[in-house]
Amino acid sequence: METQYDFDDIVNRRNTNCGRWDTMDKKYGTRDMIHLGVADMDFRAPVEIRDSLHKILDMGVLGYTDLSDKFFLSIQRWYKKQYNMDIPREWIVFCPRINIASSICVETYTEKGDGIIMHTPAYGPLQNSILKNNRKMLSSPLKKNGEHYEMDFAQMESMVDEHTKMMILCNPHNPTGRAWTKEELVQVADFCREHDLILFTDEIHGDLMKAGVRHQTALDVTEEMNDRLILASSPTKTFNIPGVIVSYMIIPNEKLRKEIEVT
């Protein structure tokens, strides 16, 4: 029997130092609006998560922590349950936030002035990981095809030169919500292989799919893609816990992992 959760009771988060509702005066000059600018929800987190946090608070000491086996095991179990994939523990790398992960990868795998391909419209903080690290953002606008968007591989080809080193992909795409198919991701894999590009993919919204659509993780496309892949994700969108600072990278290539550890 599946656990049922309450999506009817909306929590009033005003006057709680809420990054969504309590910043409206400063940002927009009014509180009389519905704020849709931040990707969190006004539903309570699952009771299992809240109970676990209560146990820590009831213990009373909020000291330094270390990564336990449970951290790695929870990710391994999730990928097994969702995708029937066995993820080796050593592939998993902790990172506080995906925005930090993307910035670390840009610093690690590229040099100042290098080009990084990213589809637009794009999630601002991922763009900043390129621009604030003094790299060149190679903008590839998505093409509208009927009711959905597509990647324009011909346009991407036209931008590549010897200084192009990486692609940053949102899968599913933010903000359009487009869920990339396996066939499209195979094209991405071929493109990155042909041009020797590192692929960073943000899959934080992968669990939030509309009925009838299944998330295609980049980890389950081709072995060649995995050799140049850094996948970043987090439980924060899935379980509505963005205030809990936790994310992770999955990096199958040992050489790429070691380079990240040095950074």
Residue ranges and their predicted role:
Residues 2-97, 104:
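N-terminal small-domain helix-loop-helix segment of the aminotransferase-like
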Residues 39-41, 171-175, 237:
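Short glycine-rich anion-binding loops that position phosphate/pyrophosphate groups of nucleotides
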Residues 46, 50, 71-72, 185, ...:
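A general structural signal for well-ordered alpha-helical segments in protein cores
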Residues 52, 222-263:
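Conserved core segment of the aminotransferase class I/II
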Residues 62-190, 207-208, 212-224, 230:
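Conserved core of the PLP fold type I
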Residues 165, 196-198:
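The start of beta-strands in P-loop NTPase/AAA+ ATPase cores
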Residues 171, 199-200:
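Residue-level marker for buried hydrophobic side chains located in beta-strands
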Residues 203:
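Walker B catalytic acidic pair
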